[in-house]
């Protein structure tokens, strides 16, 4: 399905930034442009220069299961561009100078065709004067999985508007959490919920929680919903023991910090980080020991634990400190779990016919009949006690 949105640029937005050499048009240059970035994460950007105004001029663009923005520059006033889908013979919109169009496609492949048309047949002479003039088209390709959004207040409730340059749907947010359909924008409905998104503290950035769960699906922390209280209640000895390092008490702090740092779903300040590092190293900030020294001590603790677990220290780069500590905790968990499983196997070992400790006896001891010996037990006991096993100065028991 094809969905489009067309609008005109605001007057205070200057196009001079695009009047540069085509070689300098790059994604990084415009990644944070306040206009271009609002439609999603830019994955490619192109400038089509020197397009001649001619009714025979046709521009073809491939749209591969993604969405793009078309911005027209330097187009004469009496000329418009017709945008359509070649395969579907579908006319979308006519564009003038400073107009832009956002096109989203959920189809596998579509070809966008742009052709030149004039505004009015009565302006034939003016149209002829514009023939041969040149204009530009800026093309931006966006990540199809990046939905654009903004939060609003409505009826004293916070709601999230999701769209690609236009409003697609609305969901109320509870505890900064909302649910949105995954991937296909055209199929978003309130009854079609397949994925979770989280707002950050600024209510601007939405994180697709499914991208986090893809890694955490086999993670024991994920199954307890990131709550240390649930982990302690579960009495999972392997997990509790693994989480005791490096703070001394079971904690999932480093898993939370990992997600915060990578996805920005919560707020955290420097004081919290300093407090965690102090607990981890057992040191305080003094004149002789600054924050940098404590951080180095923390790195040493992590490397020491990695060596103990037999990990290659080259893989401990500290590019994401929280992630590496959490990963080591998972390795500890796997080690403890494996050790405990082996111990349980030994304790619960069943004697099988192939491993029978009585297989070399001529008879089965459990099938031996000793009923006669049991009946004579009293006499046997007295006979044993009557035998003089002591020295002569001890009295000898006699029968009553």
UniProtKB/Swiss-Prot annotation:
InterPro entries with a match to the protein in the record: NSs-like
Function: Involved in viral replication.
Protein name: Protein FPV063
Domain of life: Viruses
